[in-house]
Amino acid sequence: MAEFVRAQIFGTTFEITSRYTDLQPVGMGAFGLVCSARDQLTGQPVAVKKIMKPFSTPVLSKRTYRELKLLKHLRHENIISLSDIFISPLEDIYFVTELLGTDLHRLLTSRPLEKQFIQYFLYQILRGLKYVHSAGVVHRDLKPSNILINENCDLKICDFGLARIQDPQMTGYVSTRYYRAPEIMLTWQKYDVEVDIWSAGCIFAEMLEGKPLFPGKDHVNQFSIITELLGTPPDDVIQTICSENTLRFVKSLPKRERQPLANKFKNADPEAVDLLERMLVFDPKKRIRAGEALAHEYLTPYHDPTDEPEAEEKFDWSFNDADLPVDTWKIMMYSEILDFHNIDQGNDAGQVLMEGGVAQAHQNYA
């Protein structure tokens, strides 16, 4: 029977099963605290993410449910994988994943990257994106701190809490500004998998230069910086802008010509610059796709078309438009957790869990 132990981390109570020991804080986000730990069952280091107050609002409940569903569905070498999930007696949710030693943000702030590492990291990012996009998922928040790396240079994309369905009417304002695609800033709608390619291009440029390519102070300044390098958006892109205020702002900017990226990236290989040119394109319809980018000459040392898999089936987004109360999201979440642990929802464990005795159910059947 699983026992729960409590520890105070940054003033936050971590309440986890005794399977996990040696808790050490490694990161704090808007929605959760992440600690490293040792899995007593496997002897391996793991990352334990506590989702803060997952059932406090319907929005948070839905966000947590979405992240859980995605982590269960996405199984790929370059995507973080879920090894355990449980709900504590206090009804906090904990995701357990593999632990990687660092992230790309930390690497980039510590030293310049050599060419072969830039190539290998970009290859793995695009390999992961090809799979994610084939599942009908857009990450939406790709940035260096969401790209985890271990001592063998294996790379995994994490944090799918903001991920969304591929939807031509996709709305919202989500990714960290420096890596945000212009169509998100320009229209707040009608964006798709191409936003991740733009973000990957910004990350690629940062690996080449050692600093962010478009470090905007706010979204107005951000867009202005982008046009200084890439020129004024073409008319057909401007025509997609739905907001009158945004349209006025874009038209008020001075006309600018696209600058050759070779002038800015003087030390980069021509193949690297060519791929970057294809990733950082204003018109998302003309932006290179992940599968095409993997076949680009720059990534020839790593490209293997027989080992760049797509998802076997599309992710089921049928829940995403649902406007449900917290209790319903909670029951759906419990059901997913039971499914993850291969517990039959019709047996006693399922009944106890569905009736709210989640901690007891976990203790008896973990």
Curated annotation (Swiss-Prot):
Cofactor needs: Mg(2+)
Active site (record annotation): D141 (proton acceptor)
Regulation: Activated by tyrosine and threonine phosphorylation.
CDD domains: STKc_Sty1_Hog1
Modified residues (Phosphotyrosine): Y173
Catalytic activity: L-seryl-[protein] + ATP = O-phospho-L-seryl-[protein] + ADP + H(+); L-threonyl-[protein] + ATP = O-phospho-L-threonyl-[protein] + ADP + H(+)
Motif (TXY): 171-173
Residues of the signal peptide: none
Gene3D superfamilies assigned to the protein according to its UniProt record, in alphabetical order: Phosphorylase Kinase, domain 1, Transferase(Phosphotransferase) domain 1
Pfam families the UniProt entry points to: Pkinase (PF00069)
Alphabetically ordered keywords of this record: Activator, ATP-binding, Cytoplasm, Kinase, Nucleotide-binding, Nucleus, Phosphoprotein, Serine/threonine-protein kinase, Transcription, Transcription regulation, Transferase
InterPro entries: Kinase-like_dom_sf, MAP_kinase, MAP_kinase_CS, MAPK_p38-like, MAPK_Sty1/Hog1, Prot_kinase_dom, Protein_kinase_ATP_BS, Ser/Thr_kinase_AS
EC number(s) recorded for this UniProt protein: 2.7.11.24
Cellular component, GO annotation: cytoplasm; nucleus
Ranges for domain Protein kinase: 20-299
Keyword Nucleus included in the entry's annotation: yes
Source organism, top-level taxon: Eukaryota
One term of GO molecular function: ATP binding
Enzyme class: transferase
Post-translational modification: Dually phosphorylated on Thr-171 and Tyr-173, which activates the enzyme.
Modification type Phosphothreonine: residues: T171
Location of this chain's protein in the cell: Cytoplasm; Nucleus
Family label: Belongs to the protein kinase superfamily. Ser/Thr protein kinase family. MAP kinase subfamily. HOG1 sub-subfamily.
Domain note: The TXY motif contains the threonine and tyrosine residues whose phosphorylation activates the MAP kinases.
Function: Proline-directed serine/threonine-protein kinase involved in a signal transduction pathway that is activated by changes in the osmolarity of the extracellular environment. Controls osmotic regulation of transcription of target genes.
Name of the molecule in the record: Mitogen-activated protein kinase hog1
Organism: Neosartorya fischeri (strain ATCC 1020 / DSM 3700 / CBS 544.65 / FGSC A1164 / JCM 1740 / NRRL 181 / WB 181)
Higher taxonomy: Eukaryota, Fungi, Dikarya, Ascomycota, Pezizomycotina
